[in-house]
Amino acid sequence: MILIEHILGNVKKDPVWQEKLKDATFDLLVLDQREAQKSRCRKLSTQGLDLGISLDRHVVLADGDVLAWDEKTNVAVVVQINLRDVMVIDLSELKSRSPDELIKTCFELGHALGNQHWKAVTKNNEVYVPLTVATTMMDSVMRTHGFQHLPFRFVKGAEILPLLSNSEARLLFGGAEDTDTHVHVASPLDEPHGSGLHVHAIHSHGTGHTHSHDHDHSHSHGDHDHDHKH
């Protein structure tokens, strides 16, 4: 087993490594988005290398990370992460609306996403939602809740990943299939350039299903209260 304790660089983001590996052969370590969130795992590369990943706990692998490089053979072990597709909702149109309309639409959109237990991140005037159901169902939810005026599209997760910070990527792609979640509006002070809408897991139904609720209740989480639509 080859022990990997450090990431050398990233061939997709680092110009230095892009130049170094422009003629290299890539031996890929293929991970799904859940595996990529683990700082420790053991897996074979596509060429059969037995790799033991043992990174610091706060470090997670990203698509394009270089784990090893043999200059003599010009072979590099590079991470390939298979990400879910993402629904991208464009909020730019709201800039022309009145403050009251803007607040109302954002609140209703956050409620609609949270009521479906969908993870989401807002950034660059867009909302990113990883697919956990068929695109036709997500399309139907958007139209049923009256968001036809908000342009939305479906793109590959790899297209969105470079736009995200590490914490946003973990939030969006880390276990996106876990659907027991609710919407949380974060303080701008949490991350200077981060997102304003986060979704965090809150409870397990135990049966692996999602559903909508139709009655209201409020409860406390220690130092703050908030309402949920149930």
Swiss-Prot record:
It holds the Pfam family UreE_N. SMART domains: UreE_N. Residues 200-210 have a biased composition (Basic residues). GO terms for cellular component: cytoplasm. Keywords: Chaperone, Cytoplasm, Nickel, Nickel insertion, Virulence. It is found in: Cytoplasm. GO terms for molecular function: nickel cation binding; unfolded protein binding. Residues 200-230 are annotated as: Disordered. Residues 211-230 have a biased composition (Basic and acidic residues). It comes from the Bacteria. One of its GO terms (biological process) is protein folding. Its main location: cytoplasm. Belongs to the UreE family. Involved in urease metallocenter assembly. Binds nickel. Probably functions as a nickel donor during metallocenter assembly. Expression of the urease operon increases the likelihood of bacterial survival by contributing to acid resistance in vitro and in vivo in BALB/c mice. Y.enterocolitica enters the body via an oral path and must survive the acidic stomach before being able to colonize the intestinal mucosa. This is Urease accessory protein UreE. It comes from Yersinia enterocolitica. The gene is ureE.
